[in-house]
Each structure stands twice: as structure tokens, then as C-alpha cells.
């Protein structure tokens, strides 16, 4: 059992017969009345967020979670398939439990969060920065970059982001998965 003084971002606990993760919290001590904690909680199973207020000292059942590195293998009708990097065990997860799946590429690394007591996979965490190849975009024309600007580009994972005009098909770009924005060109397409 934990109480509100133990709250921290990322803490997972059971509340209203479901697993919730603390996204954000704030301890409030008003001039009148008792103290309370205002929280933003994310449902671990389906990802929806709610705002909730707890009385100071309220008890919750904390759940221990573990993060382990896995390799993304492929997606099919049964879900997304992953392999444990240490034991080489494979398993699948339903698409709704896989955050950032539009940035996963076959063979790419991803952290999977497990419930420690039941070994149940709860969610995925893609790296903050990933390198992906541009598979489709309009070609850059000399002189286009004088004014700057962006154009849409489709990446090898299927995601579409805005990239600078000088990016061409075959270029590998680095993007931030949290903001879903282009950061830099990692390598230019070979012109063989």
C-alpha cells in the first residue's frame, strides 16, 4: 500500500478495479480545508487519461512494473509481435496497447513494461528518437530552400511527418517520437 505522499510520475497503481499510471500530480495545501493531490492518470490498458483528485493521505495499491528491452518483429491479424532480447521469447500484444506503433520498424528496439507479479505486458515505450527512411515525398528542386518551408513525407514505418524541402526519397531522417517532428537528416539517399 502506498499513500499520496508516495505519488511520483510513472507510478502505477490499482484504482477503481483498473491499472492506472500517474502522468502528472500536484500537492495542494489550501488555506482552508484539508490538503489534497490533483492528478492526471492514464489507463494502462487503453491509454485514456482522466483528471482525479485524492485526499492527502489516501491509500492506493501500488503495482510494481519492470521495463525490458525487446525487438519489434512484425504485425499481423493477431497483433504486434516482439522478441525478448535476453531470452529470445516471442509474444504478441494487441495494437491498442502499443504506443507509438507508427514509429516502429521491423528489427527496431522498444521497451515493454510488464506487471512484475503476473508478467503481463502492459504497454510499449518507443525510443524518444528514431531513424527512419523516407519512402515517399515530392522531390526537392534547386532553389526551393531559399524561403525555407516543409513538405509531407511518408516514412518506412507508414508514419507521415513534415520535413524540410531538401529531404528526398531514400534519405534517413531522425525524428522525435514525443513531438512527432523531424529533427535532422541522418544520411542522404545514395545516387547509384
Swiss-Prot record:
Region Disordered, residue ranges: 133-157
Keyword set includes Cytoplasm: yes
Region forming the signal peptide: none
Primary site of residence: cytoplasm
InterPro entries: Elong-fact-P_C, NA-bd_OB-fold, Rib_uL2_dom2, Transl_elong_fac_P/YeiP, Transl_elong_KOW-like, Transl_elong_P/YeiP_cen, Transl_elong_P/YeiP_CS, Transl_elongation_fac_P
Pfam families membership: EFP (PF01132), EFP_N (PF08207), Elong-fact-P_C (PF09285)
Assigned GO CC terms: cytoplasm
GO biological process: peptide biosynthetic process
PROSITE patterns: EFP
Record flagged with keyword Nucleotide-binding: no
Assigned protein family: Belongs to the elongation factor P family.
Protein name according to UniProt: Elongation factor P
Gene name tied to this protein: efp
